[in-house]
Amino acid sequence: SKIRTADRTYVNHEQGSYESTDGSNDFALAGSGYFCIDTARGIRYTRNGSFSVDDEGFLTLNGMGRVQGTDGQPIRIENEDFTVDERGVISVSQDLGEDGNEAGMRQIGALRVVDFADYEQLHKEDYGMFSTNQAAEEVENP
């Protein structure tokens, strides 16, 4: 047969260009690293930062799973008015409470961003997701 097939697929893990969106829940990683998504098949990794808040208040990657925080748990957003700073720290707005705390922003967690020593061990899955058996290294300042 004269038909040739590729022995393997190459995935480019280098930084791509940024695309501006109107989505307030769309995030991009500067430099290396992957968001951690808690899926039905276990933890998966992606650079896709097009998140939303589900009916239970969790930050999700639509149809894929819940976004993990630095504590290893899915991130629960307490209300729709939240911000994420350049370090991935998530804050929610709070009203003046009975306890006398001032209204303003309160930190509730941070996006878990990890990187890997060997990108060749990342296995490409559907929708820009990756799996691996290698240990993930936490990115300190994503």
Question: Language-model segments: which ranges?
Answer:
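Small-polar (Ser/Thr/Gly)-enriched, low-hydrophobicity segments
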Residues: 2-93, 102, 112
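Amphipathic, heptad-repeat alpha-helical segments used for oligomerization and assembly
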Residues: 136-142
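Short C-terminal domain-edge/linker segments immediately following a structured domain
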Residues: 67-68, 90-92, 124-128, 142
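A short beta-strand/turn structural motif
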Residues: 101-126
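Context-gated lysine
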Residues: 2-4, 124, 140
